Structures are given as C-alpha cells and as structure tokens.
A protein has these predicted regions:
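Activation corresponds to long, low-complexity, non-globular regions
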Residues: 1-72, 222-224
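Membrane-lipid interaction segments
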Residues: 76, 105, 109-112
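Extra-cytoplasmic beta-strand recognition segments
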Residues: 112-145
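Short, surface-exposed beta-strand/strand-loop-strand elements in extracellular ectodomains
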Residues: 142-156
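Solvent-exposed strand-loop boundary residues in beta-sheet-rich modules
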Residues: 153-159, 205, 222
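Extracellular carbohydrate recognition and processing domains
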Residues: 156-192
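Extracellular beta-strand ligand-recognition surfaces/modules
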Residues: 178-224
Length: 224
C-alpha cells in the first residue's frame, strides 16, 4: 500500500506541474498548524487525544463530550525518507475515532489554526488535501465517503460564524482534492472584524475507520 501511495503521489504531483505551472505559481502558502505539521513530517507516536487540547502546535481534535464517551487516537509517520514536492516532508497523519455504542456524538473534528494576517491578505484560497479512509474489515456501519470542510471565524464581540460547508470526497484509496474559494466568496467572508480563524474537518460519526491524511496545505491567491 505504501509503495502504491508513493507512486500515486509522484504521478499526481508530476501531472499537476505539467499541466498548470502558471496556476501553481499564482498561489503562495498560508501558514496553518496542519500545514506546518506536514512540512516538518515529524513522527507522532499513537496517542489518545484530549478534546480541544493541541497534540501538535496549532492542531487539535474537537470531540463531543456531552453525548457518550467518544474519543480519538492520532499518530503520524514518515512515508519514506527525503522531501516531497515544494520542499515538504512526506508523512501520513492517522486519525482513528472511537464511538460509543449507545449514543451518537454530535461531532468529531480535526481542527487547525490559520494565519489570520495571511488570510486577510488573500484574494482567494485553495485548500489541497490527499486523504483516504482505512475501513476495518468487520465494520458494519454506513460511512459517508467524504469529510466536510468549514472555516470558523471568531469576530469582535464574541460572535462566531461558520463558512464553506464544503464536502471533500474521500475514498478508500489516496485521493487528491482541491477546494477553491474565489475572490467574490472571499469578499463575502467580511474578514475585517475577525480575530481568529480555524479550518475544521468534520469526520463521519459512525463506523470503525481511520482517516489517513497524507497532505494538507492552504494556499493564497495572489492579488497580482
């Protein structure tokens, strides 16, 4: 599986570079906790995470602690030695939710901090992911083949608004996807009074599975 992933990743990166070099040049990185985690590609031993406590700088799990005893384990490992495209490390973040038998939780999320200054300067966004589900052989639950991406904005006065509600398709094989936010949609976010920005991946709420995330990057469309 890992060999197949390396081959697929190399083919995808080569394909993108070949067909759209100008488009890639028009984007620059926006710092996020998850992006930094993948850039460093440092291993994380399997750990049972505490809700809303960082397991890496700027990265944490959101867990519904009011309904049942939902939990999650995370780990990270290098896929191979050396660096990936664009100077990035090559690593895999594994997120394994554990669900209560009786009560369905309201949410299980993977969350990351986003550089607010860079977000406010961006004319548009592109959010790149490579991910797949590893579903246990004995799983009997219906697991949606997607995760939902949201941008949560904390505003002055304590107001919080959620945006995007974008479904990222996730298969059982590594799949690359780009979510795009154009200039018009960026204007509608009204970022002037925003004090904090988070990107949130909402995971399926049932089943025996592990979300495998091999790449995460937020890119800003240059105004020029």
């Amino acid at each position: 599986m890992e060999r197949m992933m390396r081959i697929l990743r190399a083919e995808v990166e080569g394909h993108i570079a070949a067909i759209a070099p100008a488009e890639l040049d028009s984007y620059c990185d926006i710092e996020t906790g998850l992006g930094q985690l993948f850039a460093e590609a440092r291993p994380i031993a399997p750990v049972s995470v505490e809700p809303y406590k960082h397991f890496a700088k700027g990265v944490w799990m959101g867990l519904d602690t009011e309904n049942g005893d939902c939990g999650a384990t995370v780990s990270m490992k290098a896929l191979h030695d050396g660096m990936g495209g664009n100077g990035r490390g090559v690593a895999r973040l594994s997120v394994n939710p554990v669900f209560p038998m009786a009560v369905k939780p309201g949410w299980v999320t993977l969350e990351t901090a986003v550089s607010l200054e860079a977000l406010k300067r961006a004319a548009g966004l592109r959010i790149d992911t490579v991910s797949f589900f590893d579903i246990a052989a004995g799983n009997s639950a219906q697991i949606p083949r997607s995760v939902t991406l949201n941008l949560r904005l904390h505003r002055q006065g304590g107001k919080v608004t959620d945006h995007l509600n974008y479904r990222i398709p996730v298969s059982t094989m590594p799949f690359e996807h780009s979510a795009r936010i154009g200039p018009a949609a960026m204007e509608e976010l009204s970022l002037g009074d925003v004090t904090e920005a988070l990107l949130i991946l909402e995971l399926p709420l049932a089943g025996t599975y592990t979300l495998k995330l091999d790449h995460f990057a937020v890119l800003a469309l240059d105004e020029g």
